[in-house]
Amino acid sequence: WGLGFFRDCRFVERLINLDKAISCTYHGQDLRTRGVLKPLNDLSKLNITSELDLFSKHPNLDYMFLPYDTKQFSFDIKINDPIRICHAPTNRYYKGSETIIPICKRLAKEKEIEFILIENKSFNEAQEIKKSCDILIDQVHNRGGWGYGMNSVEALSMGLCCVTELIPEYIDFIPDNPFINVDSKSLFDVLSELVTNKEKIIEYKQKGYEWVEQYHNYNNTSNVLYKYYEDLGWL
């Protein structure tokens, strides 16, 4: 979060005096709303983020995909009957839920699918519900960061087909991404076509599971992190 134990960074300065290396990791809202703490920013030799939009807010960032244990779930490519679509907002405004929820409710009536809104549940409850679904709608509008985050990483690891809004910059950054790209205007039509094409859902389930394993598995992300350390002479 780009923070030490104290705002004046006295603890970090003590570590520097002990010849310790300092690295900062920015997760999104920290840099978007607060910015950097200058004393700590001056001392940090490595600044890492998994949020692509932060690159416009800091001149010295390195990227690392969100680390995750992608093997903790058993991958099941089967599709429910009826198809189950879920949306799991931690913050409705940031996820564009006011757009997503009415569209999914309409779809449930017209296409005979199930829509599950995952809110106000314990972590374990939310995970179990999400695992039982076929499609996750992550976000539209990109109000709280671009594209996708841990919500989608979890869902891809579970073998879900993931739908979200990716801006052109993100598509250029991850051109082999497994997401079905939508915006507020196209969401209903895209979902309407998707739920009538089970082969396409299966295709994206498989593609997503392979992609999240390649980029987000913690063994792969740790290799990226250690390469940054090696480049700085820390290993």
Where are these regions (language model features)?
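Donor nucleotide-sugar binding/catalytic pocket of nucleotide-sugar-dependent glycosyltransferases
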Residues: S23, Q29-L31, D42-D76
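Conserved active-site histidine-acidic residue motif and adjacent donor-binding/catalytic loop
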Residues: I118-I129, R143-Y148, V153
